[in-house]
Swiss-Prot record:
Catalyses which reaction(s): uridine(2552) in 23S rRNA + S-adenosyl-L-methionine = 2'-O-methyluridine(2552) in 23S rRNA + S-adenosyl-L-homocysteine + H(+)
Top enzyme class: transferase
Organism annotation: Methanosarcina mazei (strain ATCC BAA-159 / DSM 3647 / Goe1 / Go1 / JCM 11833 / OCM 88)
Protein name: Ribosomal RNA large subunit methyltransferase E
Primary gene name: rlmE
Ranges of residues in domain TRAM: 196-254
C-alpha cells in the first residue's frame, strides 16, 4: 500500500507538471495549516529541484524565492539564489530580494544525503533544520510562518522546543504524501515572535503598577510582562512562562527585599 501511494504521488506529479512528488506534501501542509496565504512573500530554503517553489507560487501569487547550494532550473515568476543559507552574504541577498521588512513565510524541505546510519542521518537532519530556523529568524517578518522537515529521533523534542520558543503556535504534522514508513515529519510554526525575551528567561524587576487583571505589569526593553501574585513596590526575580506577540507572562521565582526596606530595617 505504501509503495502504491508513493507511486500515485509520483505519477500525479508527472501528470500535473510538478518537479517532485514532494509538491503534494506542501499542498497538504497548506490545506491543514494555512501556512501560505494569497499575496504572501515566500522563501524556500534548500529548494532544488523546485517542486515546493511551484506550489508556493500557485498558492501565493506573490514574490517567491528559492535558495539552494545547487542551481535551480528557472520557474516562471520565481527568483532563485545559489548559495549557502549559513552565509551572511546569502542572507543579504535574500533580504535584498524580499525587502527589509522580511518574508511572510519561510519553508524548508531539505534533507541530508542518507548514509544508512540512522543516528548520523537524524543528527544531520536536525543540523539542517537548525540552519533553516536560524535563517528564518533573520528573514521572517513579525508574525510570519515557518515550515520545516525533520527526521524523528532523540534530538527531535529539543528542536521542537526551540521552534516553540520562537513562534506563538507550533504543530508537528505528517502529510499523507509522506511515505507511511518514513520518519520525516514537518514542524509548522505560526506567528514568528520578535519579542526581546524568550520563555525561561529570568529577570529581577520592581513592580511599579498592576494591570487591569490584577497582575503586576513591568516593561522589559519596552515589552510588557505580566507577573502573577505580586504587589506594587515589590522587587522580585521572575521567570518568563509564556511569550505572545505583544506581551509575556512570568512567574515569581524569588521575592527580594528592596533597598528601601533594607535601609528602614538598618535605621530601626
Amino acid at each position: 500500500m505504501a509503495r502504491d501511494r508513493r507511486d500515485y504521488y509520483y505519477h500525479q506529479a508527472k501528470e500535473e507538471g510538478y518537479r517532485s512528488r514532494a509538491s503534494f506534501k506542501l499542498k497538504q501542509i497548506n490545506e491543514k495549516h494555512n501556512v501560505i496565504k494569497r499575496g504572501d512573500s515566500v522563501v524556500d530554503l534548500g529548494a532544488a529541484p523546485g517542486g515546493w517553489l511551484q506550489v508556493a507560487k500557485q498558492l501565493s501569487g506573490g514574490k517567491v524565492l528559492g535558495v539552494d547550494l545547487q542551481r535551480i532550473d528557472p520557474i516562471e515568476g520565481v527568483e532563485t539564489i545559489q548559495g549557502d543559507i549559513n552565509a551572511e552574504s546569502t542572507i543579504k541577498k535574500i533580504i535584498k530580494i524580499v525587502g527589509e521588512k522580511g518574508a511572510d513565510v519561510v519553508l524548508c524541505d531539505a534533507a541530508p544525503n542518507l548514509s544508512g546510519n540512522w543516528s548520523y542521518d537524524h543528527a544531520r537532519s536536525i543540523e539542517l533544520a537548525t540552519s533553516a530556523l536560524e535563517c528564518a529568524k533573520k528573514i521572517l517578518k513579525p508574525k510570519g510562518n515557518f515550515a520545516v522537515k525533520v527526521f524523528q529521533g532523540d534530538m527531535f523534542n529539543d528542536y521542537l522546543d526551540e521552534v516553540r520558543n520562537n513562534f506563538v503556535r507550533v504543530k508537528a504534522y505528517s502529510p499523507q504524501a509522506s511515505r507511511s514508513q518514513s520518519a520525516e515529519i514537518y514542524i509548522i510554526g505560526k506567528k514568528f515572535l520578535t519579542a526581546p525575551l524568550r520563555k525561561g528567561d529570568k529577570f529581577v524587576v520592581d513592580i511599579e503598577k498592576l494591570g487591569s487583571s490584577g497582575d503586576g505589569a513591568v516593561l522589559i526593553e519596552g515589552f510588557v510582562v505580566f507577573v502573577k501574585e505580586v504587589e506594587v513596590g515589590e522587587k522580585v526575580r521572575i521567570k518568563i512562562s509564556d511569550v505572545k506577540p505583544n506581551f509575556a507572562f512570568a512567574d515569581v521565582e524569588e521575592r527580594i527585599e528592596s533597598s528601601e526596606t533594607e535601609n528602614r530595617e538598618k535605621s530601626d
